[in-house]
């Protein structure tokens, strides 16, 4: 999140805490303002032309044949013992990079070691030119996060939610100014840290 968006941290939490699922829309209440979020609204603010899909896929609910993923992702693909997920490290370097981008931007996940078969199909469709209703997908993630009131491991799409709040005229109060970010590590500090780590390895050996 940028420095400006960091000021919205508490408002984003309020968004998820107060939202209710009403069919194919989220009824939201933040700072006394009520508004609705739908896939169509997301397409409007993100300037996305949605594909004409009668029933957009809900990737979390899908069960896949292993052969499909082996053919598209990797012949060396490793599945978990129960067959419900794949080992990310068994993907090619290019797909691992795409997976990390996917995890951080489109399909939040608390661990990047394994991904379930639904996320694997999402990855497969990205590299196979299969149409994805990304707005329906984002709405599904928002909806799922709202429903999981007691088990929110991560809060997804913080920047998107803060943008929605801005468009609705909802801003943080003056006493919620963001904390200053720490300065980045300079090259001298980085080299010193690497040298210190090498000394520790030698002493252990």
Identify the role of each PLM range.
Residues 1-202:
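A structural signal for long, well-ordered, hydrophobic/aromatic- and basic-residue-enriched core segments
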């Amino acid at each position: 999140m940028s420095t400006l968006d960091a000021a919205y941290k508490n408002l984003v939490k309020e968004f998820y805490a107060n939202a209710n699922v009403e069919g194919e829309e989220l009824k939201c209440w933040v700072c006394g303002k009520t508004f609705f979020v739908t896939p169509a609204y997301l397409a409007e603010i993100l300037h996305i032309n949605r594909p004409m899909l009668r029933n957009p896929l809900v990737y979390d609910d899908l069960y896949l044949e292993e052969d499909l993923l082996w053919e598209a992702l990797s012949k060396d693909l490793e599945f978990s013992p129960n067959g419900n997920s794949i080992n990310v490290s068994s993907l090619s370097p290019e797909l691992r990079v795409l997976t990390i981008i996917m995890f951080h931007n489109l399909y939040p996940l608390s661990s990047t070691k394994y991904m379930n078969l639904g996320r694997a199909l999402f990855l497969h469709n990205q590299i196979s030119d299969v149409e994805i209703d990304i707005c329906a997908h984002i709405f599904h993630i928002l909806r799922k996060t709202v429903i999981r009131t007691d088990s929110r491991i991560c809060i997804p799409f913080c920047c998107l939610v803060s943008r929605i709040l801005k468009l609705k005229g909802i801003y943080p109060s003056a006493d919620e100014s963001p904390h200053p970010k720490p300065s980045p590590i300079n090259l001298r500090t980085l080299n010193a840290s690497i040298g210190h780590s090498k000394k520790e390895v030698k002493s252990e050996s």
